[in-house]
Amino acid sequence: MKLPIYLDYSATTPVDPRVAEKMMQFLTLDGTFGNPASRSHRFGWQAEEAVDIARNQIAELVGADPREIVFTSGATEADNLAIKGVANFYQKKGKHIITSKTEHKAVLDTCRQLEREGFEVTYLAPQRNGIIDLAELEAAMREDTILVSIMHVNNEIGVVQDIETIGEMCRSRGIVFHVDATQSVGKLPIDLNQLKVDLMSFSGHKIYGPKGIGALYVRRKPRIRLEAQMHGGGHERGMRSGTLPVHQIVGMGEAYRIAKEEMTAEMDRLRTLRDRLWNGINDIEEVYLNGDIEQGAPNILNVSFNYVEGESLIMALKDLAVSSGSACTSASLEPSYVLRALGMNDELAHSSIRFSLGRFTTEEEIDYTIELVRKSIGRLRDLSPLWEMFKQGVDISSIEWAHH
């Protein structure tokens, strides 16, 4: 077993060796290096064929038509294209958008930008377990609502939203429905033939493909229109200009092909490992599971350890690559906005750790993790005056702290 142990698969994944090998064939003079937009020679045709194959592989995993897949530089760009693209195109119809407070920053900050441009955004607070209350969502829908954007699986706590029902609610009212599926694609079954989802964002690097490539699913029937955010040569049916990075696209396609083949068995394996981890630490005093294990993705476990400072815990767990919050925001010392939105106090939010498991996680690593966490929590609490007071029965919330 190699240390440190990587348990941050929700931040990024290593590229699968099968994917890397495939990508190598599309870089050098000996490989297929052409520009897929070059129509006049075989270098271009071969590159275009490789892109078509990858587009099909992605569409097959999610039950879409390959013509509905638009390549972007990642899920952040896909979120931006979806939300700004719809807002700009449909603004004559209305200027109201609904999303939730626990979305990824790529959705929240895009909505904030639209607010500055005169759109109105409703941010729904989820229930205590992170799930959106559908009655609240329905109550928020108005005549001028043009877009609802709700993620499939939350990147911090792993809860799964009921996108099937939300899709029905939106479709019956003629509201466009966007789903950020970055954390769910290749992990949970997605069938866009059945789901009433109009736009869906995907990433390559969260599912053992390369970084710097993603895609946006744009429904054709009923047709969803977008205003392009990137202008140029009119690539990707005018929705996203820019020369296609063939090696990245091939890598993403291969990663999605592998995910389709291995998903069912792999998710059972990860669910077993996640449960093993939780069962190994849930009898520690003052430990709280964030999210909902029943309605949660099989690969994410977010836990708060009361009376232990999150940063010091991460230092103590230096043999584990874990995070507090998401990778995009964990550099700030602010407690996770996702956990705050669940109504959690600052102390508990500060003491949270996200364990996210993946393809190369082993049972041996999980057992090592359990032992290390138990030891570290014990040691840090021995040093903690707050823990001592708690054990003596002092109500810590009633203490008047001196302000210096």
UniProtKB/Swiss-Prot annotation:
Its EC number is 2.8.1.7. Its cofactor is pyridoxal 5'-phosphate. It is found in: Cytoplasm. Coiled coil: none annotated. The keyword Iron-sulfur applies. GO terms for molecular function: 2 iron, 2 sulfur cluster binding; cysteine desulfurase activity; metal ion binding; pyridoxal phosphate binding. It is an enzyme of class 2 (transferase). Its main location: cytoplasm. Keywords: 2Fe-2S, Cytoplasm, Iron, Iron-sulfur, Metal-binding, Pyridoxal phosphate, Transferase. The modification N6-(pyridoxal phosphate)lysine is found at residue 206. One of its GO terms (biological process) is [2Fe-2S] cluster assembly. Pathway: Cofactor biosynthesis; iron-sulfur cluster biosynthesis. GO terms for cellular component: L-cysteine desulfurase complex. It catalyses: (sulfur carrier)-H + L-cysteine = (sulfur carrier)-SH + L-alanine. The active site is at residue 328. Transmembrane segments: none annotated. [2Fe-2S] cluster binds at residue 328. Pyridoxal 5'-phosphate binds at residues 75-76, 155, 183, 203-205, 243. Gene3D superfamilies: Aspartate Aminotransferase, domain 1, Type I PLP-dependent aspartate aminotransferase-like (Major domain). Homodimer. Forms a heterotetramer with IscU, interacts with other sulfur acceptors. Belongs to the class-V pyridoxal-phosphate-dependent aminotransferase family. NifS/IscS subfamily. Master enzyme that delivers sulfur to a number of partners involved in Fe-S cluster assembly, tRNA modification or cofactor biosynthesis. Catalyzes the removal of elemental sulfur atoms from cysteine to produce alanine. Functions as a sulfur delivery protein for Fe-S cluster synthesis onto IscU, an Fe-S scaffold assembly protein, as well as other S acceptor proteins. This is Cysteine desulfurase IscS. It comes from Pectobacterium carotovorum subsp. carotovorum (strain PC1). The gene is iscS.
